[in-house]
Regions:
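Active-/binding-site microenvironments in catalytic and ligand-binding cores
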Residues: 1-274
């Protein structure tokens, strides 16, 4: 299905029938990604002992009905909001934009700490997604102001699809990189790492606070100057997608909570003209 859109004075053609999914498959019976020591996501047949119902056709029931247990922040692709850091509850699904968002996809190689940093000070073995790397990778010719950025870290190993990050220190954003995204007006960030901050960072959450516009130590939602921003973590960006301009759609269920499982979709533009 072809559509023609006008964005920032530029006419764009896009095939809405062929999106590329950036969501990791969460296989309850197989290998699956997880982070921060969370248990595996799991499912089991729902049972009502009083009624004698067991939600499994294999076990003789009339239909399948499963009880699913997972930690959205740690099991698979998820989208979160400023409510991740505040006393007041904010549901991520209420913040996720409806429709398509102008986006750019960039590929970067995380770098050793140098002139850029975070809080607490990165360890020598840490690897950072830096402002410098983002500036180098940013597409030169983008037909619109990107409101979303998708970051693919290199090397892009297929093992990311089911990696257990527990006990590891995956790459994370430098505070300079987070500030760059904010300065460029990016409201929606998609990354293929489990967190934009260091896994164990003494609770600082520096990049999160910068991206959501939440001052250090503040826990009131009213203090967040970018409460309409979202961060999507643990995505996977296939190699078949070239760096450049796209349209992003964030699909999420209407579940309460500051993070929800999500399915980011990228739509390639078939043409554009100013």
């Amino acid at each position: 299905m072809q559509a023609r859109l006008a964005i920032d004075g530029c006419e764009i053609a896009v095939d809405l029938s062929r999106p590329a999914s950036l969501a990791l498959e969460l296989d309850f019976q197989g290998a699956q990604p997880r982070h921060f020591g969370a248990p595996r996501a799991s499912s089991r047949p729902y049972e009502t002992p009083g009624l004698g119902f067991r939600g499994s056709v294999e076990r003789g029931s009339s239909c399948n009905c499963e009880l699913i247990t997972l930690v959205p922040h740690c099991n698979g692709t998820h989208t979160e909001c400023a409510g991740h850091l505040t006393r007041e509850r904010l549901d991520a699904w209420r913040v996720v934009p409806a429709g398509l968002v102008p986006a750019v996809l960039v590929s970067v190689t995380p770098e050793a700490p140098g002139s850029e940093g975070s809080e607490p000070t990165p360890q020598p073995e840490d690897r950072l997604i830096t402002r410098r790397a983002l500036e180098r990778a940013w597409p030169a010719a983008v037909p619109f102001a990107a409101r979303a950025v998708v970051i693919r870290t290199l090397p892009n190993s297929p093992e990311k699809r089911a990696r257990d990050y527990t006990g590891q220190t995956p790459p994370y954003l430098s505070q300079e990189a987070a500030a760059l995204l904010v300065g460029r007006g990016v409201l929606h960030l998609v990354v293929d790492v489990p967190s934009i901050d260091r896994a164990h960072d003494e609770g600082r959450l520096t990049a999160h606070r910068l991206f959501f516009g939440l001052p250090r130590g503040a826990v009131q939602l009213a203090a967040a100057t970018r409460a309409d921003a979202t961060v999507t973590e643990l995505a996977f960006i296939p190699d078949a997608l070239a760096d450049g301009a796209y349209l992003l759609e964030l699909q999420v269920p209407a579940l309460s909570g500051d993070a929800v499982p999500s399915r980011p979709l990228l739509y390639a533009m078939t043409e554009h003209a100013a």
